[in-house]
Amino acid sequence: QFCREQGIPVWADEIQTFTRTGNFFAYETMGIGEFIDICTIAKTAQNGATLFTEEFKPDPGLLGGTFSGTTPALSAGLEILNMMDHDGYMGPQGKVMQIHHDFVGMLNELNETSCKGLLREAGGLGLMVAVTPLDGSKDKQTLLLKSLFKNGLICFGCGSNPYRIRFLLPAILSKA
């Protein structure tokens, strides 16, 4: 509200989060959509795009290059978005949240069984999940990341104190 009162535009960077929270936009999940003036999306859309309110609409020709897409990428992105919109991916009971609950549940189950006490604080939001390995130190995080990579799983580090392992889950996962 302060930014609105001061005429400061609010920019939502949804490059990573677009469609990954159970809503199309993370700002919808956070309940702050009314304050967003500019929003960038990519990845799931198969294209980088900048969305904006009428007030911040740029003059023709101002956006180009990086923000442009090829016809095949735009077509693929549209199909993906249509599928997510019409095939039950979005919403609190949608496939995105089901994948989240299943994956976090599996991490917690690992912590209770074969990896007893080695994985802590599994959680996150939608298709973005993180877990704290071992004691949460940088050294343990690095060792686990290298071991996961060596075994064919690409994961990323995040956080500090504790250091965590993050997963960007694909929306096509199933229990099978």
Show the residue positions of the predicted features.
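Conserved N-terminal phosphate-binding loop of PLP-dependent enzymes in the Aspartate aminotransferase
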Residues: 1-176
